[in-house]
């Protein structure tokens, strides 16, 4: 784990654009797979999806203002990350990335035996454990009672959070402009997105 975290930290520090485009491909592929699982999409479903995307994008935008990483925040990150173990198509790494704690958690893993790092990682694990216990029943009930709507909202959340993983150098407000500005800097970024896209497709086929 420590060796792997060192590699990821190196990539994040030196190849952030390539990593961002790779995650972008992962997300787009996950969205397509999840949409394919929904049968008979109606206009109301599309409206719910768009509304969910808008809500989460605004929440994440507010979260990025004066964000301070504390033990409580790391606990919340662990709590939210527990979704990745319950919900299909969501990566824990992706959730940490959009919450702005991915780099922080990896650094703490590399210095795990420091008292400070140990407390942060413990807070994260405890938050995840509480999240699993809490979310498992709620998510199970939602999928049993409102499977289609739950999937639609989940996809909307994924789409709405895309802007958080793409560097927004020109401070654009529109996700399409953010994406265009990012990929227009280097066409090689499309290649990394394609790899991410194909990875999810391959994993999905293997799982079947």
Regions found by a protein language model. Name each.
Residues 1-87, 91-208:
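Multi-pass membrane proteins that catalyze or facilitate reactions on polyprenyl-/lipid-phosphate substrates
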């Amino acid at each position: 784990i420590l060796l792997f975290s060192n590699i990821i930290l190196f990539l994040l520090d030196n190849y952030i654009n390539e990593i961002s485009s790779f995650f972008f491909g992962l997300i787009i592929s996950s969205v397509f797979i999840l949409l394919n699982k929904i049968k008979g999409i109606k206009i109301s479903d599309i409206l719910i999806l768009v509304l969910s995307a808008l809500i989460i994008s605004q929440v994440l935008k507010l979260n990025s203002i004066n964000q301070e990483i504390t033990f409580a925040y790391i606990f919340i990150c662990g709590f939210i990350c527990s979704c990745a173990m319950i919900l299909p198509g969501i990566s824990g790494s992706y959730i940490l990335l959009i919450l702005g704690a991915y780099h922080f958690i990896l650094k703490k893993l590399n210095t795990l035996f420091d008292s400070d790092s140990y407390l942060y990682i413990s807070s994260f694990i405890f938050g995840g454990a509480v999240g699993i216990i809490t979310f498992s029943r709620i998510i199970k009930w939602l999928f049993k009672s409102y499977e289609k709507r739950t999937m639609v909202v989940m996809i909307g959340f994924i789409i709405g959070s895309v802007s958080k993983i793409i560097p927004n150098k020109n401070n654009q407000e529109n996700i399409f402009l953010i994406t265009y500005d990012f990929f227009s800097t280097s066409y090689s970024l499309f290649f990394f997105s394609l790899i991410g896209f194909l990875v999810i497709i391959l994993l999905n086929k293997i799982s079947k």
